[in-house]
């Protein structure tokens, strides 16, 4: 990376504190997983809200910090990570007897867990290799300014992605429970339903941002690096596609047979890296990196479908019919009116609100009438009516 010599000390502090934060987050995984496995989503939500509020507080503290803001920022993030770990650990220690540390030696269990963790580590390394490799390639061929543009796009992606991640987290225990009970029909239903619902919600959030990216970035940052708008749009497309991957990833974890999954997906990530290098070297266009990532994710989705068919017997044609067909209908029908408004109106605040309102109305209606089957619409209607009576008819 290109780091100014006078900022090398701060960069080293940031690097060390980032490693320490990563270690704390890894140690906290068994406790947060226990909370999710017991479906204590209220506690999970409280901890998440605390985490978000504290990170927001950091932003205000940075404005008045009398010392190096980068080191101060990294230090506070590390402190928040410690608090998150303590909250998870203390709650699990009080509520769940199995979270207590006891001396046990089960060779078969250790072998199984070791294999699971090792192959998961391979998959995670391949993802880090590709994602960080993109940063290095952008830095090498396009410079730090273009890398900053990617950083902005990733910030927006993380903010939007957190919403559907929480929804998927709430569904994951049921997918795993269905597999453990050998109830494959219910498992397929949950995979299909969560894929569609998370996709529709993500589409509802991302379409206005993709259309009005220039306006939003102008209000948020004023001046921003070149390529930021294109990076943001392509990154959000990848984010939408990830909603189709997450349920299948959870289903794979439920089987415990992660070797084939991580080997194939990891190989795809690694193979794409030299291809990306050749393309950026020949074209010099940074957008091609993100376009290749979109293509890779599409290939990865269908690769995962073949893995699901082999591992849990999920028919690919059923996924195409019950998920992909509905999604395609929602994508095109939900975007027509917002896109027309975007093209016909001037770039003003009025257009921004008009496009946002049109996206909410059109995508909601398209998702309800075209994106759900009859049973899902009935369940959704009953749920909305139930919430209405609880909130407004007390």
Predicted regions: what is each one?
Residues 22-50, 71, 92, 236-268, ...:
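Membrane-interface junctions at transmembrane-helix termini in multi-pass inner-membrane proteins
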Residues 70-76, 86-132, 174, 181-189, ...:
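Interhelical loop/hinge segments that connect adjacent transmembrane helices in multipass membrane
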Residues 37, 96-97, 153, 157-195, ...:
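Helix-loop junctions and terminal segments of transmembrane helices
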Residues 1-2, 61, 164, 188-243, ...:
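Alpha-helical transmembrane segments of multi-pass membrane transport and lipid-handling proteins
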Residues 70-75, 108-117, 136-158, 185-190, ...:
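Interfacial/gating helices of multi-pass transporter permease domains
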Residues 20, 76, 82, 118-119, ...:
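Alpha-helical transmembrane segments of polytopic membrane transporters and translocases
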Residues 38-42, 53-86, 90, 94, ...:
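Membrane-interface helix-loop junctions in multi-pass transport and translocation proteins
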Residues 309-317, 338-394:
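Membrane-proximal transmembrane or re-entrant/amphipathic helices at the cytosolic face
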């Amino acid at each position: 990376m290109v780091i100014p010599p006078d900022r090398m000390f701060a960069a080293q502090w940031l690097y060390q504190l980032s490693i320490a934060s990563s270690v704390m987050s890894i140690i906290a995984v068994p406790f947060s997983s226990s909370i999710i496995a017991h479906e204590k989503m209220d506690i999970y939500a409280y901890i998440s809200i605390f985490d978000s509020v504290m990170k927001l507080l950091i932003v205000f503290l940075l404005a008045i910090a009398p010392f190096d803001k980068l080191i101060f920022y990294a230090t506070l993030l590390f402190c928040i990570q410690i608090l998150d770990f303590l909250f998870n650990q203390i709650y699990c220690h009080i509520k769940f007897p199995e979270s207590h540390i006891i001396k046990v030696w089960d060779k078969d269990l250790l072998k199984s867990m070791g294999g699971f963790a090792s192959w998961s580590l391979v998959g995670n390394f391949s993802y880090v290799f590709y994602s960080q490799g993109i940063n290095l390639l952008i830095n090498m061929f396009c410079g730090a300014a273009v890398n900053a543009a990617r950083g902005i796009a990733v910030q927006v992606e993380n903010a939007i992605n957190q919403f559907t991640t929480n929804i998927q987290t709430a569904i994951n225990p049921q997918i795993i429970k269905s597999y453990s009970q050998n109830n494959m029909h219910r498992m397929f239903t949950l995979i299909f339903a969560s894929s569609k619902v998370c996709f529709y919600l993500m589409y509802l959030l991302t379409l206005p941002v993709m259309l009005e990216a220039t306006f939003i970035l102008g209000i948020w940052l004023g001046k921003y690096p070149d390529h930021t708008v294109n990076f943001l749009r392509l990154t959000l497309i990848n984010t939408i596609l990830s909603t189709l991957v997450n349920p299948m990833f959870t289903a794979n974890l439920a089987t415990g047979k992660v070797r084939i999954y991580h080997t194939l997906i990891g190989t795809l990530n690694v193979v794409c890296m030299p291809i990306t290098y050749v393309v950026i070297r020949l074209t010099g266009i940074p957008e091609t990196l993100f376009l290749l990532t979109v293509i890779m994710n599409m290939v990865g989705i269908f690769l995962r479908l073949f893995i699901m068919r082999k591992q849990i017997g999920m028919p690919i044609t059923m996924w195409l019919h019950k998920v992909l067909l509905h999604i395609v209908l929602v994508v095109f029908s939900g975007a027509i009116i917002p896109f027309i408004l975007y093209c016909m109106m001037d770039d003003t605040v009025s257009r921004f609100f008009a496009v946002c309102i049109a996206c909410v109305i059109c995508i909601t209606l398209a998702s309800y009438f075209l994106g759900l089957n009859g049973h899902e619409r009935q369940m959704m209607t009953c749920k909305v009516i139930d919430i209405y009576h609880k909130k407004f008819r007390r």
